[in-house]
Amino acid sequence: MSEHDSDVIFAGSIPKLYEQYLVPSAFEPFAGDLVRRLQSRHLTHVLEIAAGTGVVTRALAKMLPSTVEIVATDLNPGMLEQAQSIDMKRPVQWRQADALDLPFPEESFDAVICQFGVMFFPDKAKAFAEVYRVLPHGGVFVFNVWDRIEENDFPNTVTKAIAPLFPDNPPRFHARVPHGYHSVEIIERDLTAGGFTSKPEIEVVTRESRARAPRSIAMAYCQGTPLRNEIEGRDELLLGDATVLATKALTERFGRGPIVGKSQALAVTVVK
């Protein structure tokens, strides 16, 4: 398996650590913002793709009327397992699905939503074409992507901190994948290639990421994301060392805790 193949694997202990450490600091601050972009619409069926451990699914369940049917999908069974272990307070249909080949008929959802998942799709235009296919005319696709890593304090600090462990080939997962798809021109191009003809609304959204202590963030990024696969692929014995280095760098920059850092994303809304 190549390094780039491991970019999309959220397995083993990653889903639990992801939910425990990464979701509260990185994803919860943006989940409500994304769902609010759907609230003014009359909806009956909503599809979530790349749902992960369900942080946006929980926001959908809380913020949308109880009459709206929610279907949540993810490529990784381990992430869905973790998501289903958390009470949603209302029925949600969970399905394993590849965003590049959605197992749903044409025009079957009023809206499709995706939080911080698009960056992982190997063929974004194809994924957008699948979203386009399952939406009716007037249906809406809302998603967000991380802005460049330099605008996001915690992953940027972690990425720089662990680089000296691997001087010949530093792990760049976060810069390459989660923070590697932020060009407005490229996003618009890929949406057009996927069939969308209306101009997307793209908004910069800035939030604060918070954690009780630097180690929580070090655990989140080093062990709760595919960066772990990248580190262990180089030397599995250095995962602990990488986490220690990241903790030290975060402590030096943000203090011993609780800590606060800037997070920035792009929120995209496009209508079929």
Kindly label every feature range from the protein language model.
Residues F104-E106:
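Short amphipathic alpha-helix with an adjacent loop that forms part of the alpha/beta core around
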Residues Q39, P65, D87-M88, P122, ...:
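Short conserved AdoMet
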Residues H45-L102, A111, K126:
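Class I SAM-dependent methyltransferase SAM/SAH-binding core
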Residues A61-L64, D87, I162, L191, ...:
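Conserved hydrophobic residues forming the short capping helix/wall of the S-adenosyl-L-methionine
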Residues E3, D7, P15, T53-V55, ...:
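Conserved Class I S-adenosyl-L-methionine
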Residues D110-K124, D147:
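A short SAM/SAH-binding and catalytic strip from SAM-dependent methyltransferases
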